[in-house]
């Protein structure tokens, strides 16, 4: 396995197993690691490794915006769900990529929406 991929996978493994040890980037070009993480949509998880990169400020701002969006969606979901339950309206929260099969046009399924099933 190429050192770039080994380092990338070790960083992700450490994140998933709560190991706080930073992974040394020996022999790995930080720009190549940045491009790999960008390709796999995992840049926010590798943020500490890019502090010396010119894109760091922009990436940090993007990460903050992404987190804010997730928190807003989480709040909206909880609020909507609690309002329906308070009115004794049964509902089921639908999550996951499998929902995309139910949309005739993939663009109709955007991130940031709330999918609920309310039985008749």
Show which residues each predicted segment covers.
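Helical scaffold of the NTase/Pol beta-like nucleotidyltransferase catalytic core
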Residues: 2-95
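Active-site nucleotide-donor binding segment shared across nucleotidyl transfer reactions
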Residues: 79-114, 118-120
């Amino acid at each position: 396995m190429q050192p770039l991929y080994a380092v990338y996978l070790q960083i992700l493994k450490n994140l998933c197993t709560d190991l706080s040890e930073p992974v040394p980037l020996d022999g790995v070009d930080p720009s190549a690691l940045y491009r790999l993480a960008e390709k796999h949509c995992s840049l926010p998880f590798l943020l500490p490794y890019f502090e010396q990169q010119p894109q760091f400020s922009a990436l940090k701002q993007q990460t903050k915006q992404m987190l804010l969006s997730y928190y807003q969606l989480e709040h909206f979901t909880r609020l909507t769900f609690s309002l329906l339950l308070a009115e004794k309206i049964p509902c089921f929260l639908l999550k996951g990529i499998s929902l995309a099969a139910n949309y005739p046009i993939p663009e109709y399924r955007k991130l940031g929406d709330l999918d609920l099933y309310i039985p008749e």
